[in-house]
Regions:
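Bacterial signal peptide processing site
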Residues: 21-23
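Helix-turn-helix repeat elements of alpha-solenoid scaffolds
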Residues: 43-55, 82-94, 122-125
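Structural register within alpha-helical repeat arrays
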Residues: 32, 76, 113-114, 152
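Terminal, low-structured helical/coil segments at or just beyond the last alpha-helical repeat
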Residues: 129-130, 134-138, 143-178
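Residue at a conserved register position within TPR or TPR-like alpha-solenoid repeats
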Residues: 43, 80, 118-119, 156
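C-terminal motif of bacterial Sec signal peptides marking the signal peptidase cleavage site
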Residues: 16-19
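Post-signal-peptide N-terminal segment of Sec-exported extracytoplasmic proteins
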Residues: 27-31, 35-75
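Short solvent-exposed coil/turn linkers within tandem alpha-helical repeat scaffolds
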Residues: 59-69, 98-107, 122, 136-150, ...
């Protein structure tokens, strides 16, 4: 009898644990999490970042074939870039491009990763150039490829150096027209 009661207790516990499984996230849950990302001053609420990004990624994990999945992965990437979480941003960009190769915002994701992560945050100029080159090679007819061609010229430069280079280039064009 005691053995039977132990087995029943184990079965009830196992059933209870299964019933307490992970909640399936909805897009409404994600929209609520997204609203927590900005504070009253309009800047990123760093305390909300881990929870929101975790929810965005969990939705993608739970619903990999949902048409909104790549958009939420892209949103997670944008948040991690803004938060300065370079390694996490790189992982998210890689996952986005690999798992959703036809997603329309992949070129934007790559350009943001090249510019904000590799160039500005990590100062890994070779990876920044390689990522821009990937955009040029993989999306040659996109506006992002045209931007990447220009951005390669500016890798490693400060905003002041970029401005100076642009002004000098425009001055040379004007002089050539005379």
């Amino acid at each position: 009898m005691k053995r039977f009661l132990n087995l029943m207790m184990l079965a009830v516990l196992a059933f209870g644990m299964m019933a307490c499984g992970e909640k399936k996230l909805t897009q409404d849950d994600l929209k609520k999490a997204e609203l927590t990302l900005m504070n009253e001053e309009g800047s990123l609420n760093m305390e909300a970042v881990p929870v929101a990004v975790e929810q965005f990624c969990k939705f993608v994990e739970q619903n990999p074939n949902d048409e909104a999945a790549p958009q939420w992965l892209f949103k997670a990437l944008q948040v991690e870039i803004k938060a300065g979480a370079s390694e996490k941003a790189i992982e998210l960009c890689d996952k986005l491009v690999k798992d959703y190769p036809t997603f329309e915002n992949n070129p934007a994701a790559l350009v943001m990763t090249a510019s904000e992560v590799y160039d500005s945050q990590l100062h890994d100029l070779d990876k920044a150039r390689a990522t821009y080159q990937k955009v040029i090679n993989d999306y040659p007819n996109s506006d992002w490829a045209k931007n990447a061609e220009k951005m390669i010229e500016f890798v490693g430069m400060t905003p002041e150096e970029i401005f100076s280079k642009i002004v000098m280039s425009e001055m040379e064009e004007v002089e050539g027209e005379w």
